[in-house]
Regions:
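C-terminal functional module detector
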Residues: 2-12, 17-251
Length: 251
């Protein structure tokens, strides 16, 4: 997801349990919360429109970003425009449950596989526990183009906490809030001098490599009649990301 957004693709985040495939513990371990504003009744179509627009955040239900904005702009409601590199103000209201289940999926048990599998709900990395972790603090991070640029520890006490961050923006970027691995907002794009987001050539090259791997394994399942058209589509995608790599910052 980060790699695609670094290439300027506005892919919106959503989440759900996919019970029992992604999580066999219970329905509702993965959730999406949509900003609907003040409504008299919930309209499912409008809720879906909110997901499509990115007016949402994903969570496990024990961590929440009740408000999140960049220079007053919330995810899915528009972009922040800057004429040159400068500073933006990120504000959020976050809340964390006073008691959180103990487990790898909630980030409070380190699996033998290390940090890269923290939050995984597919595999059982440690014995199941019915115990809860009470209190403590949760690290809230501001992410710009995939990198954490600021953070603050917030009490897990069930109360709402307002946090504010001044963030420097050097080029067109996406900005989001996360608490790993329980919470992530959709981003707000900050566009500098009307330039597209081209945050990382490495991200574009990663996408090229993924396309090659996909073709290697998927092409065998494509009929011979349809394979030339499929190959052309893969080639167009690869060429697009190669062009983005040329336009991007190298790192």
């Amino acid at each position: 997801w980060y790699h695609l957004m670094n290439c300027g693709f506005p892919l919106k985040l959503s989440g759900e349990t996919d019970f029992p495939c992604m999580s066999s513990r219970r329905v509702g371990q993965g959730r999406v919360y949509v900003q609907m504003g003040k409504v008299d009744r919930l309209d499912f179509g409008e809720w879906c429109d909110g997901i499509a627009a990115g007016k949402s955040y994903v969570s496990d239900g024990f961590a929440h970003a009740l408000e999140f904005s960049v220079d007053g702009q919330r995810p899915g409601f528009g972009e922040v425009k800057l004429s040159a590199a400068g500073k933006v103000t990120v504000k959020a209201t976050v809340a964390f449950a006073p008691a959180t289940p103990i487990g790898v999926a909630y980030g409070n048990v380190m699996p033998s596989g290390g940090r890269r599998v923290v939050g995984d709900t597919v595999n059982l990395h440690a014995p199941r526990s019915m115990d809860y972790l009470n209190g403590g603090k949760r690290k809230v991070e501001i992410v710009v183009n995939g990198e954490a640029v600021a953070s603050v520890d917030v009490p897990a006490d069930g109360a709402s906490h307002e946090v504010t961050f001044p963030v420097n923006i050097e080029k067109s970027s996406w900005v989001a809030l996360r608490h790993f691995p329980q919470l992530h907002t959709n981003p707000v794009n900050v566009i500098v001098n009307d330039k597209p987001i081209r945050a990382s050539a490495d991200s574009a090259r990663w996408c090229v490599d993924v396309i090659k791997e996909l073709w290697k394994f998927r092409s065998k399942r494509i009929s011979e009649k349809e394979r030339p058209a499929a190959r052309a589509a893969y080639d167009r995608a690869e060429a697009k990301f190669r062009q983005i790599a040329k336009e991007s910052v190298t790192h």
